[in-house]
Amino acid sequence: MLKTSSKISDLFFSPGKPPLVEVSGKLAPAGTTRVLSSEDTRRIATDLVGQNQHAIDNLKQLGSCDVSYCLPGAHRFRVNIFMQRGSCAIVMRVIPGTVPDFDALNLPVELKKIIGLRNGIVLVTGPTGSGKSSTLAAIIDRINKEQSYHVLTIEDPIEFLHVHKNCVVHQRELHSDTPSFALALRAALRQAPKVILVGEMRDKETIEIALEAAETGHLVLSTLHTIDASKTVERIVGVFPMSEQHTLRNRLAKSFRYIISQRLVPRKDGAGRVAVIEILKSTLRTREYVEKGETDGKTLLDAMRVGEQEGMQHFDGNIERFIREGVLDMETGLAYATNPGNLQLELSDLPKSVEPDPLLETSEK
């Protein structure tokens, strides 16, 4: 039942439905039509959790838990088990068996500059399933090949397994190796890493220690579940009380190096999905906007629009290029755009493949 292919991103086990897989963003049958019962999903959950007492306790007390699962000789999975209507439901994210190659992911050339950074914070953001972990793994792998550093990762759970190459790479997993991101990150400052990957900046304490690490000469890589660069800054600032936000903005402006946001969009030819990427880079202009806050005519999006020569790009510009190159169709591209009405105007010279949608205008307001 756990056989996978390169096109499958997730597996779903839910009472009342046959097993399902997600292929290129859409659910499809997993090869059997037998409907799962509550007892079926309970047994599957029990097998996946095994003797992980922390996961067992979380499922009982909090109604959900996260575990990693390895299928011998095949794939690894990041598993979330949760209660719904009194029964277990399971989502298994497929983790490829090999670390993704930077060039194979077709990441923007600008992101190669991260490999040479000596300090600061790099954030990769996007919704669940947008490829954040793959991008970070590819960056870590390139650092592992080209630098001679101590690299430390703190993950929940560990996804891609890195072997020592030119670097020494230590990977710590939440709950089995450390009780929290914040404690592991604090300990990391005494473990002499040059590069620290924090799986997610979930809380105020983790953000504060990440900033401290960046300010004391470490390169910190992490993720946030935000949709673009502007929302990322506001999310971080919003974690802190008003009395601390001015100081926080100042520290963040000085520490951030890149904010990379991703969306995976179905390709026009049906051959999977393509990563649409937004890049906000630390420049004099963007540091000012982060520190002082965005105002009319002085937004991070404005900075990205005029910052192409500095290596920046914004979602809608990236989507426009893919539409013009025939990688995306117009309807799909507009559905994933930040400002679909504006993008539709930019594409007005192309043959109309979709009718103008009045909802595109209202979605921007």
PLM regions and their residue ranges:
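Short, flexible helix-loop junctions that flank or precede catalytic/ligand sites
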Residues: 1-365
